[in-house]
Every structure is written in C-alpha cells, then in structure tokens.
Amino acid sequence: MNIQALLSEKVSQAMIAAGAPADCEPQVRQSAKVQFGDYQANGMMAVAKKLGMAPRQLAEQVLTHLDLSGIASKVEIAGPGFINIFLEPAFLAEQVQQALASERLGVSQPTRQTIVVDYSAPNVAKEMHVGHLRSTIIGDAAVRTLEFLGHHVIRANHVGDWGTQFGMLIAWLEKQQQENAGDMALADLEGFYRDAKKHYDEDEAFAERARNYVVKLQSGDAYFREMWRKLVDITMTQNQITYDRLNVTLTRDDVMGESLYNPMLPGIVADLKAKGLAVESEGATVVFLDEFKNKEGDPMGVIIQKKDGGYLYTTTDIACAKYRYETLHADRVLYYIDSRQHQHLMQAWTIVRKAGYVPDSVPLEHHMFGMMLGKDGKPFKTRAGGTVKLADLLDEALERARRLVAEKNPDMPADELEKLANAVGIGAVKYADLSKNRTTDYIFDWDNMLAFEGNTAPYMQYAYTRVLSVFRKADIDEQALASAPVIISEDREAQLAARLLQFEETLTVVAREGTPHVMCAYLYDVAGLFSGFYEHCPILSAENDAVRNSRLKLAQLTAKTLKLGLDTLGIETVERM
C-alpha cells in the first residue's frame, strides 16, 4: 500500500472543498523528524498565495474538511501552515497484517508499461573494465525494480559490435588462425585488440587489408560476417561470466548491438533529407539544431552521414530510438549511459522528436551517472596507471571477503565460506556503488565497502541474519504466527511499522527516478530502526505471548522487507554470517 498516495488524495479533496483549484498539489511528504508526525502536507503555501490568503488560514479551513478517521490519530498545523499527520497505531497494525499476508508485502501494481532499459553496453573484442560497472549494476537495479512492480521490461544491451575497427580485428583473427593460434589469441581479448592495433599502426599492407575487409563486412560478405560473428560470440561469452558473477540479469538474448540498426541508416538519412531536416554541408549530411549553439552562437550542425558515406553514432542512436518505439512498442525508454554522453543523446533525441519518430508522450530519459574515482580523487586505475579489468576487481573483492569471513568464522566449512565470501564480496562492490547518488562521482574504497558498520552490504547482510536469528531462537512456526494479531503500543514499534510500510513509496521513487541509492538509504534506515526496536522492546522475553507474537511479526516484516529490497538491488542475502 502507498500511504503517501492515500494521504495525498485525502488532503487534495479537503483542499478543493476549502476552495483550492482542482489541480492543487497537496505536497504530502514523509516527515523528516518524529515530532512532525509521519507525514507532512506542505502544499498550503503555494495554493494560499494563489487564493490571496494566509497559508495557516487555508490549513485551518482544510482541516475542517479533512477526514482521516481510521488512518490518523492526530492532525495538527505547524509553523506558517504545514499540516502534520500522525498515523493511528491501529491503522499501522492493520497494514502490517496485510503486508505480511501478501507475497508482495502489500505493494500494489501500477498500470503496466513496456519499458526499454539500455544498460551495460560493452565493446566487442575488449574485456569489460570498471567503467562498465556503474551502467551495468545501476541499470540492473532499475530493471529488477520495474519488473517487481509488474512492468514489461525489455533489457537492451547496446553492445559496440560495429565500426571500422572490425576490419583490423578480422584481419588479425585471420592471421592468427593461419598460424593455428586463433582461439588462444582470443582467450586474452585485451591482448588480442592491442596486438591487432599495433599491426594496424605499423604494417601498411596489414592496414590496407583491414580497410578492404571493412568494406566487405559492410557489404554483407558471408565469410566476413562469419568472422565478425565469431568475435562477437567470444566476447559475449566472456561478458556473460562477468554478468553471472555480478548477479546481473542480462543474458545473451538481451544483446541489441549497434549492428542491429545498420539496415535502417540509409532510410533515416533519406527521410531526414525529405523532411527538410537534413541538408548537404561541405559534402556531409548535417542537421542544424537551433536548440544547440556553436561557439559563434549559430545553430549547431550534427553530422549524420560523413563525406565518405559512413554513418555516425548519432545516426545509430536516432535509429535506435525509432526502433524502440516502433518495433519494441516502448512506453518509456531509459538510458544508463555516463554523463559525458548527455549532449550527444540530447541532440539525437531532438532530431528524433522533430522527425516524429517518437512522440512526446513517450519519455526518452538519460539516467546519467558520474565516475568511479580512486582515493586520490582521480579516475580509478591500476597502480601502473592502466584500466582496471572488471574481472580483476571482482577477484580482489572475493579474496578480501574470503579473508574477512574466515577471520570471523574460523570453523566454517570451506564450501559455506566460499558462498558467504562471494555474497559479501560481490555485494560490497555493488552496494558501495548503488548506495551513492548515481549523478555524482564517488571514491572507491575497499576498507569502507567491506566494513560491518555504516551503510554497507556487509552491514545490511548482517542486519538481515540478525533478524532471522530471532526466529531461530523463538522456535515458532510461521503458520502459527499468521493468525496472531499485531499490537502497536510503543513508540519504537510505531516508528518501525510506519517505515516498513513506506516500502512501496521507496520502490515508486526508484522506478520513477532510476535512483537505487534511495532504496539503500531506506533499507539502512529500516535496519537502524529495527536495532532500536530490538534493544528497547524485548521480543523473546516480552511480558506475554500476545506482545511477543506481535513483535515477532514486526521482525518478520523487517526480514522480508530487507530481503526483497536487497533483491531489487541485486544484492544476495545469506541465512547466517
């Protein structure tokens, strides 16, 4: 249930009854401090101004029309006209019961949409590096959240599988195969690409052959298509290992590489010309956009076809947006691409809108993100200054977690220890990233992310096992607990219950804004509130069975919420730590 939405509707009706316009915005928000209640309605200021009255006067009139019986125990006006709403303990108890009775914890399903999510996007014949981490895991958290809410989500892995470099790569693969070293060379993708580039730069005959191969590949020659396909297959097989290690839901079926849009490009250029949007300029085909200015203050020219007939990333991105609307029938498209690509995307989408390829009713959203930095505040690199391979980063995470877990559990069986180390190590890397606002850069710090205190994966995983341990000690049957009533009589019970019931509101924000850090902050808050509740409200030694069972049910909803919330982030939970 979305309590915020319920209160918004009630306050809005009361505002209209008090003379506010029908489109008034009640601005119901979760209260930041306990003394201001559970929710605040802050919309009186803006509406009172329009009505030419004092906000407090409007708030008083709204209260005469506001019926929150059975929902709120107290409603009061604070300051210049804020309305503070304190939820009724019996209402909280009833909602906790309903949440526990539902596999979805009472989370409702919005109108189902088809949502395309573009994320990860590694390049063929190159190993994934740390620069791919953010797009991959933030995008996947968004996908998991949207799917949980009931949307039809299409994962689009926009792999870099096309371009002039493929002539060079095919020529090098051919040379390696002639020397019976093709498979061995491809086992080290990074080395393969580096060696191919070295030959291309130093051997003119090789470079000439590579340029000819590009033409043959682009003309659809079967032999060159087969060689190209081999490069794609080997790369994606290696990438799949990384996706599986990261507990990311991408599979081979989600690959929608740049090559997919090639057949569309000539038609798009011709259509943009026919619509008068594209013109010839110095031999190239260009779209001039008034919305973007060059240094001289003139409309910026965006090239969609070069003088030599080649196409650009912008052309592909125009085709891509068109395809996602016309073929995939997207109601919404989310792009998890770093912030440096923002202007490029905005230009492509401006052309898309002007050409009528995607209507304004279908949002194209750039969910951009900042960079991962080292402790020195510079882009995260190896000690030698090279790019950090993602596989190497995950190996190190596993090794560090292994040491940490073994230290705390010296007698744990090896297989159990390995499983726990994997959950903690991979979880730590992912959570450290997901818990930061995606729009900002963040410092990558092993010590912080593997700490058992603070907003970290190990702390959250431990918090979950701590709640489960209460049930093990209680030795109670879940079915027997189901019929027990929930009683909210203590402040800490009410605070924990109210926060647990804000799970749907949190999911809604993550789905709308693409901000998994909001879920991390929520879960961390829940864990903290449970800790205070556990300390001050005895569960197993409660004064009677009714209170004991009620508190066990609050613990039960806490465990389920933590598990489900962490699952939407792609973070594994464990039963014991």
Curated annotation (Swiss-Prot):
Its EC number is 6.1.1.19. InterPro entries: aa-tRNA-synth_I_CS, Arg-tRNA-ligase, Arg-tRNA-synth_N, Arg-tRNA-synth_N_sf, ArgRS_core, DALR_anticod-bd, Rossmann-like_a/b/a_fold, tRNAsynth_Ia_anticodon-bd. Keywords: Aminoacyl-tRNA synthetase, ATP-binding, Cytoplasm, Ligase, Nucleotide-binding, Protein biosynthesis. It is found in: Cytoplasm. GO terms for molecular function: arginine-tRNA ligase activity; ATP binding. It is an enzyme of class 6 (ligase). GO terms for biological process: arginyl-tRNA aminoacylation. It comes from the Bacteria. It catalyses: tRNA(Arg) + L-arginine + ATP = L-arginyl-tRNA(Arg) + AMP + diphosphate. Transmembrane segments: none annotated. Belongs to the class-I aminoacyl-tRNA synthetase family. The gene is argS. One of its GO terms (cellular component) is cytoplasm. A motif ('HIGH' region) lies at residues 122-132. NCBIfam families: argS (TIGR00456). The lineage of its organism: Bacteria, Pseudomonadati, Pseudomonadota, Gammaproteobacteria, Enterobacterales. This is Arginine--tRNA ligase. Monomer. HAMAP family: Arg_tRNA_synth. It comes from Salmonella agona (strain SL483).
